[in-house]
């Protein structure tokens, strides 16, 4: 397009509109500036250096926050980023020049430095001749879109108005019959009615106006020295200082009273001025800014005060004409005479504070005190405070005093050469001078450094920095700015301080062993314990500052993220395996093999195809999908081990051992039974030799195997040639670990038990890697064919979870701490030794040890005995019978979502609804769901469960249980486990949990992505919320950059992530994950998180006692106190209040609805009476308070005790207790017996412990059944049948349908459910 036409669309009009709206600049101006600069070509490059559509220089681009690489990833080549930056720059210039868009455009084109600044000054004077021809043409080209008071003058400058378009001959000779048209061009030739442009009145020449104002010419003014007016400036500083005012007032007759009046603040003056006095003050005080000299005084001194005020004004007016050097010198004098300059601000404390260097203590103190003095001076002498000048003067004064002391030090050094005297002030002073010059001259800040070759390896709270080698403690930031060591925002200083004294958790409720690991460790009084814990966990109460802990990824964060994505992978694999098993090879004809054998066969084919890629062509399409999922999973784990820094910690290094077969690795786990059979046949030494021979066969026959083994052995032995003996020894050593130990068998990877932390750093999966191939067969002594693969276990539903449990821990620890598991273990063991003899600290260190066990997939307790396994089976049955209402009850947890308005994504499971809700958004609901799945995976899942053989094997190997008992108890536990896991009510519980958490996170993702793409901000970017999530503003900006860089617009106008794997592996994605995790925490309590685990690992009996109560205990800190702390620490009091009110409404509403549903479990005749009791307003209020997710935890704890003591209101609020008939009132005059009290309390206790109650009801069922069989008459039989019905109801799910079914069965068998007549 050779000529600009605003009616011709471009591909970037949407970006222009979005950037213009976001930055408050004219769309037409921004668009035409882009056309003028580059003709809308994103890759345009000027010969002089500017690049991209908006033609940014390197310096300008960096100043605007763009990445400059001169490569294809240079942000100047990104139209969206460049246009937004240009809009931001134009908006700033327009505001700076009071809305003059032409002047802003000139500054954009010519800059504001050495070349541009004179042109801008000429523009202000109307001297267009002094503006370059390029600048004038640039402005003229924008006259039709730029608003400016100088537009008319520019248009007439240089002659007549610019010419119109040439007139074709056929138009010129067309005559008056030619059809005219309305255009934006000049009038056509068929009309001669040309009107000129009305011009403004002739302006007074600037030189004349300047002479009249200043009494000197421009040349005289410009030739002034920088120290011009020093005398006037110094007099003003001295006269108007506090000391000067005191001296001048003292010369008056009533001097003390006058000075007292000048220093008295207006608000403290009790005198009420009369109308006459007020009028006198208004008319006689020359400048209103100096009126405070008078208004603090008394009427007796009014004339003297007015005189002082006017003298102060005249002094300051003369000083205002002085040059910069004169003002600075006068400021130094002012600082010198001010008493506050000599206040020892830091004093003794600062001398021992290692983070503060001497020079900036002196300079910064003087600057700060001089600013305070400036405020005091203007309150006494009147006028406008010049805080910048005061700070500069004070700084230089402090520096000067420091220089004097340095001169003394230099003299001392000559006499004592061994002494060290450093002057560290020169660097900060030079930067200060450069910044002040840039500010005053509107030029580039020369104190900023070139950052192109800097690595920025340091980081604190999301702010990367590079050490400045020439100045101790100083750092360079990404934008090139340098921060001194004592700068309060220096990230290195802040990091060192946090390491010296890590922040402590906010006060919480500690309940011995039930105290959360996060609170116990981060709430420690020992700074060393907190220093370790801050990288591992988060406190449920948050920290004392209101943050949730580390402003970066903790080990628990990484562990939970990996666990979620692993669960998604397992579900994908399960579905792919189900599809593969439907292949005709397995699904047609006679039954060739069981489902288990079919699954194992497919797994084996997929694993071998990964290890030998040439086998992939033999796979069916469905088997290929299975293989791809497995391969992608192990490849991703390898990438994470190689680069754990993707979680945001630049100190994290690779923990992956060198491997010569990347991309073809599947963990080698050996089947215990297959190995035992081989040892029985060949002996351990025979099996070792067979394994080694099989491996040697691959070494001899496959060049790639030989090459990688030789390479490794050369490095290992430091030789140039590898001998056959070296290879054979390596093969035999590796084979010994398989044939002579259980280290790498399938039983050893199910769950490891270790004492303390001994050996916790050992990772058998990484140690088991070898460089041979295991698929080649050899002939054994008995003539049988054997390959190492014959010993392997290929069941991926056993191998993958075990591999992930172990590897995820090492990744999480390195990714958060920058340390290996061994280094962390050694640090914790040192803390343990230090805490010896202190029970409280020892308990906190043990909590740290347990945290590491959880992260690395180790058991915190010894293996369950037969007794404990039986108790866990009973717990399963109690859960099966009492969890019907819990899935629906999850809805009462979402008060936080409702209050923040984060409800749009609640329809994400209904395609039509979700698409409708996101129809107007730049990203579709389907894309959000896929992005969420790639980043967060699946939160709660029970797909991976121990098999019956695993449980039996564990009992036999880890306890002294015989085979028969192990089989019985193992089968029982497996059966109850499957019963509880497959229950529809369990699936509803897990399903609603995942659905609501996904909705909360997807809603936040949608908001942030939409706001980023449209240039807006969201509720999630508020300071209080970000602090509560431990996300810095810089990290939030990084999240936005991540979104912009990875999202592209499709043909349908919707944005999508072009590579979700790359998106999720970007370090900034971890900050996005943490932000969404905070949203999920506010949506629902998640007791399965690492930080919320009990600090003591309770056994099966403890779990039985606390079944269904752990949620209430965790709510005390995570919901009740955290809501309170968020309210007042993070300025979210309104959110906290609304969430409490909303949660009470949800709890009360759910209780009322649940009461109606529960009533259906009763006989029809008894429902009305039950509902009258349950729906009593007092009961509803009690339930609303006690079951509120935000406020209810304390009262719910009281209800736990109240239920045991028999209070009906405490029982009715619990969903695990079935509705009962009306209890007959006890005669109040009848004495109590111990049997009666213990019997009632025992019954109540069993109701509060569902698992124990289940056992009691099994016993009652058996005894009632025996009573029915042996009853002597019909009436007795009916009584036993009624008892049998009541005990049976407690053994089945507590949903109303099942309960009603039980009632109908017994009613059909003769049980009379109606009340007997009295």
UniProtKB/Swiss-Prot annotation:
Transmembrane spans: 1137-1157
Periplasmic face of the membrane: 1-1136
Parts of the chain on the Cytoplasmic side: 1158-1318
Catalytic activities: Exolytic cleavage of the (1->4)-beta-glycosidic linkage between N-acetylmuramic acid (MurNAc) and N-acetylglucosamine (GlcNAc) residues in peptidoglycan, from either the reducing or the non-reducing ends of the peptidoglycan chains, with concomitant formation of a 1,6-anhydrobond in the MurNAc residue
Region of interest: Essential for viral DNA translocation: 1314-1318
Subcellular location: Virion; Host cell inner membrane
EC number, UniProt record: 4.2.2.n1
Membrane topology: Single-pass membrane protein
Keyword Lyase: yes
Any one of the GO CC terms: host cell plasma membrane
Top-rank taxon: Viruses
GO molecular function: hydrolase activity; peptidoglycan lytic transglycosylase activity
Pfam families in UniProt: SLT
Keywords in alphabetical order: Antimicrobial, Bacteriolytic enzyme, Degradation of host cell envelope components during virus entry, Degradation of host peptidoglycans during virus entry, Host cell inner membrane, Host cell membrane, Host membrane, Hydrolase, Lyase, Membrane, Transmembrane, Transmembrane helix, Viral genome ejection through host cell envelope, Viral penetration into host cytoplasm, Viral short tail ejection system, Virion, Virus entry into host cell
GO biological process: defense response to bacterium; killing of cells of another organism; peptidoglycan metabolic process; symbiont entry into host; symbiont entry into host cell via disruption of host cell envelope; symbiont entry into host cell via disruption of host cell wall peptidoglycan; symbiont genome ejection through host cell envelope; symbiont genome ejection through host cell envelope, short tail mechanism
Location, primary (coarse class): virion
SUPFAM superfamilies: Lysozyme-like (SSF53955)
Sequence segments annotated as region (Transglycosylase SLT-type domain): 24-111
Active site residues per record: 37
Cross-referenced HAMAP family: TRANSGLYCOSYLASE_T7 (MF_04121)
Family: Belongs to the transglycosylase Slt family.
Domain commentary: The N-terminus contains the transglycosylase activity (Potential). The C-terminus is essential for the viral DNA translocation into the host cytoplasm.
Function: Component of the cylindrical core that assembles on the inner surface of the capsid during capsid formation and plays a role in viral DNA ejection into the host cell. The inner core is composed of stacked rings of gp14, gp15 and gp16 proteins. Following binding to the host cell surface, the internal core is diassembled and gp16 is ejected along with gp14 and gp15 into the infected cell. Gp16 probably inserts in the host inner membrane and remains associated with gp15.
Quaternary structure annotation from Swiss-Prot or TrEMBL: Homotetramer. Interacts with gp15; after ejection the gp15-gp16 complex composed of a gp15 octamer and a gp16 tetramer probably binds both the viral DNA and the host inner membrane.
UniProt-recorded name of the protein: Peptidoglycan transglycosylase gp16
Organism encoding this protein: Escherichia phage T7
């Amino acid at each position: 397009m050779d000529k600009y036409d605003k009616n011709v669309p471009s591909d970037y009009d949407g970006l222009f509109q979005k950037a213009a709206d976001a930055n408050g600049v004219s769309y037409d101006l921004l668009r035409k500036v882009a056309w003028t600069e580059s003709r809308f070509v994103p890759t345009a490059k000027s010969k002089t250096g500017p690049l991209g559509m908006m033609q940014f220089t390197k310096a300008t681009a960096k100043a605007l926050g763009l990445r400059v690489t001169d490569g294809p990833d240079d942000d100047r080549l990104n139209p969206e980023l460049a246009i937004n930056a240009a809009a931001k720059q134009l908006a700033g210039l327009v505001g700076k020049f009071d809305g003059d868009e032409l002047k802003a455009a000139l500054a954009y084109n010519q800059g504001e430095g050495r070349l541009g600044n004179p042109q801008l000054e000429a523009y202000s004077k109307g001297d267009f001749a002094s503006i370059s021809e390029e600048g004038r043409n640039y402005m003229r080209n924008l006259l039709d879109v730029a608003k400016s008071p100088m537009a008319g003058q520019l248009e007439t400058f240089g002659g007549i108005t610019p010419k119109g378009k040439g007139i074709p001959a056929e138009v010129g000779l067309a005559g008056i019959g030619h059809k005219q048209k309305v255009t934006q061009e000049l009038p056509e030739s068929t009309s001669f009615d040309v009107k000129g442009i009305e011009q403004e009145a002739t302006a007074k020449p600037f030189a004349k106006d300047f002479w009249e104002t200043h009494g000197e010419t421009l040349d005289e003014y410009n030739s002034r020295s920088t120290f011009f007016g020093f005398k006037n400036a110094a007099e003003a500083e001295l006269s108007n200082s506090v000391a000067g005012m005191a001296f001048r007032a003292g010369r008056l007759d009533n001097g003390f009273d006058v000075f007292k009046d000048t220093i008295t603040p207006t608000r403290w003056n009790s005198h009420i001025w009369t109308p006459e006095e007020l009028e006198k003050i208004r008319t006689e005080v020359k400048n209103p800014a100096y009126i405070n000299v008078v208004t603090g005084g008394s009427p007796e001194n009014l004339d003297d005060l007015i005189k002082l005020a006017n003298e102060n004004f005249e002094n300051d007016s003369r000083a205002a004409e002085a040059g910069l050097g004169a003002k600075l010198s006068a400021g130094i004098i002012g600082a010198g005479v001010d008493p506050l300059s000599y206040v020892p601000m830091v004093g003794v404390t600062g001398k021992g504070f290692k983070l503060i260097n001497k020079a900036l203590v002196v300079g910064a103190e003087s600057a700060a005190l001089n600013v305070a003095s400036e405020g005091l001076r203007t309150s006494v002498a009147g006028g406008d405070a010049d805080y910048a000048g005061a700070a500069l003067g004070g700084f230089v004064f402090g520096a000067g005093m420091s220089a004097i002391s340095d001169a003394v030090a230099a003299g001392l050094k000559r006499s004592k050469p061994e002494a060290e005297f450093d002057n560290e002030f020169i660097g900060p002073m030079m930067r200060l001078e450069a910044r002040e010059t840039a500010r005053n001259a509107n030029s580039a800040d020369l104190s900023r450094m070139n950052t192109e070759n800097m690595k920025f390896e340091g980081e604190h709270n999301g702010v990367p920095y590079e050490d400045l080698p020439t100045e101790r403690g100083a750092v360079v930031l990404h934008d090139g700015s340098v921060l001194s060591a004592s700068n309060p925002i220096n990230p290195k200083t802040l990091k060192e301080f946090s390491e010296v004294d890590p922040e402590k958790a906010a006060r919480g409720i500690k309940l011995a062993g039930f105290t959360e690991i996060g609170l116990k460790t981060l709430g420690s009084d020992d700074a060393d314990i907190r220093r370790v814990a801050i990288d591992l966990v988060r406190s449920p109460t948050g920290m004392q500052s209101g943050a949730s802990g580390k402003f970066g990824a903790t080990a628990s964060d990484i562990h939970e993220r990996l666990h979620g994505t692993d669960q998604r992978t397992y579900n994908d694999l399960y579905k792919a395996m189900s599809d593969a098993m439907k292949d005709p090879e397995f699904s047609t004809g006679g039954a060739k093999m069981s489902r288990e054998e079919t699954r194992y066969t497919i797994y084996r084919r997929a694993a071998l195809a990964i290890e030998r890629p040439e086998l992939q062509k033999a796979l069916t399409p469905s088997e290929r999908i299975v293989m791809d999922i497995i391969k992608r999973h192990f490849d991703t784990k390898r990438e994470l081990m190689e680069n754990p820094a993707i979680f945001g910690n630049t100190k994290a290094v690779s923990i992956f051992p060198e491997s010569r077969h990347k991309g073809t690795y599947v963990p080698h786990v050996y089947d215990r039974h297959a190995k035992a059979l081989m040892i029985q046949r060949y002996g351990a030494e025979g099996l070792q030799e067979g394994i080694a021979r099989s491996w040697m066969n691959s070494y001899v026959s496959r060049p790639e195997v030989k090459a990688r083994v030789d390479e490794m052995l050369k490095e290992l032995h430091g030789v140039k040639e590898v001998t056959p003996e070296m290879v054979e020894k390596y093969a035999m050593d590796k084979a010994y670990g398989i044939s002579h130990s259980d280290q790498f068998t399938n039983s050893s990877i199910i769950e490891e038990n270790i004492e303390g932390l001994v050996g916790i750093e050992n990772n058998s999966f990484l140690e088991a890697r070898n460089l041979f191939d295991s698929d080649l067969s050899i002939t054994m002594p008995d003539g049988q064919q054997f390959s190492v693969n014959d010993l392997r276990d290929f069941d991926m539903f056993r191998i993958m979870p075990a591999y992930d449990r172990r590897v995820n821990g090492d990744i999480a620890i390195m990714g958060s701490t920058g340390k290996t598991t061994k280094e962390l273990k050694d640090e914790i063991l040192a803390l343990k030794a230090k805490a010896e003899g202190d029970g409280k600290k020892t308990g906190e260190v043990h909590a740290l040890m347990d945290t590491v066990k959880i992260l690395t997939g180790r058991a915190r307790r010894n293996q369950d005995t037969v007794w404990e396994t039986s108790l866990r089976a009973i717990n399963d049955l109690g859960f099966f019978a009492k969890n019907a209402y819990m899935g629906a009850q999850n809805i009462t947890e979402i008060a936080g979502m409702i209050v923040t308005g984060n409800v749009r994504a609640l329809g994400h499971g209904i395609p039509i609804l979700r698409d409708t809700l996101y129809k107007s958004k730049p990203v579709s609901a389907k894309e959000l769901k896929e992005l969420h799945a790639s980043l967060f995976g699946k939160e709660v899942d029970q797909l991976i469960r121990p098999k019956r053989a695993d449980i039996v094997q564990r009992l036999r190997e880890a306890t002294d249980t015989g085979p028969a008992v192990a089989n019985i108890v193992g089968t029982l536990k497996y059966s109850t486990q499957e019963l509880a896991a497959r229950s529809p009510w369990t699936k509803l519980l897990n399903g609603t949990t995942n659905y609501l958490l996904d909705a909360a996170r997807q809603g936040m993702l949608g908001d942030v992505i939409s706001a980023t793409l449209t240039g807006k901000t969201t509720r999630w970017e508020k300071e209080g919320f970000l602090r509560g999530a431990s996300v810095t503003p810089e990290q939030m900006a990084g999240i936005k950059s991540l979104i912009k860089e990875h999202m592209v617009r499709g043909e349908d106008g919707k944005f999508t992530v072009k590579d979700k794997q790359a998106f999720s592996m970007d370090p900034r994605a971890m900050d996005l994950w943490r932000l969404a995790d905070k949203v999920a925490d506010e949506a629902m309590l998640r007791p399965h998180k690492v930080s919320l685990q009990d600090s003591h690992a309770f056994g099966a009996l403890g779990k039985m006692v606390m079944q269904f109560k752990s949620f209430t205990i965790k709510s005390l800190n995570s919901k009740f106190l955290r809501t309170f702390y968020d309210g007042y620490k993070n300025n979210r009091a309104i959110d906290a209040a609304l969430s409490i009110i909303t949660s009470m409404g949800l709890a009360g509403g759910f209780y009322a609805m649940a009461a109606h549903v529960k009533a259906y479990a009763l006989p029809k005749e008894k429902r009305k009476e039950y509902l009258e009791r349950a729906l009593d307003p007092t009961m509803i209020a009690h339930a609303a308070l006690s079951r509120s997710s935000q406020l209810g935890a304390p009262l719910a704890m009281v209800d736990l005790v109240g239920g045991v003591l028999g209070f009906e209101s405490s029982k009715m609020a619990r969903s695990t207790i079935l509705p009962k008939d009306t209890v007959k009132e006890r005669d109040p005059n009848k004495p109590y017996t111990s049997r009666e009290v213990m019997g009632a309390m025992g019954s109540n206790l069993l109701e509060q412990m569902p698992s124990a109650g289940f056992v009691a009801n099994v016993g009652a069922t058996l005894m009632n059944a025996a009573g029915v069989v042996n009853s002597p008459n019909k009436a007795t039989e009916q009584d036993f049948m009624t008892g049998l019905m009541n005990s049976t109801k407690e053994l089945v799910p507590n949903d109303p349908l099942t309960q009603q079914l039980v009632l109908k069965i017994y009613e059909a068998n003769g049980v009379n459910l109606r009340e007997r007549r009295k």
